[in-house]
Amino acid sequence: MNIVIVQLGSLALITLAGPIIIVLLFLKQGNL
């Protein structure tokens, strides 16, 4: 059960952090 919870948690983090990371990278490229 713990493995399933960890997998779901990691998927949720990737789903939420994905767009944020893309935006941060875009802003960094824009600043450069």
Curated annotation (Swiss-Prot):
Its main location: plastid. The keyword Metal-binding does not apply. It is found in: Plastid, Chloroplast thylakoid membrane. InterPro entries: PSII_Ycf12_core-subunit (IPR010284). Keywords: Chloroplast, Membrane, Photosynthesis, Photosystem II, Plastid, Thylakoid, Transmembrane, Transmembrane helix. One of its GO terms (cellular component) is photosystem II. Pfam families: PSII_Ycf12. The chain crosses the membrane at residues 3-23. One of its GO terms (biological process) is photosynthesis. It is a single-pass membrane protein. Belongs to the Psb30/Ycf12 family. A core subunit of photosystem II (PSII), probably helps stabilize the reaction center. PSII is composed of 1 copy each of membrane proteins PsbA, PsbB, PsbC, PsbD, PsbE, PsbF, PsbH, PsbI, PsbJ, PsbK, PsbL, PsbM, PsbT, PsbY, PsbZ, Psb30/Ycf12, peripheral proteins of the oxygen-evolving complex and a large number of cofactors. It forms dimeric complexes. This is Photosystem II reaction center protein Psb30. It comes from Euglena viridis. The gene is psb30.
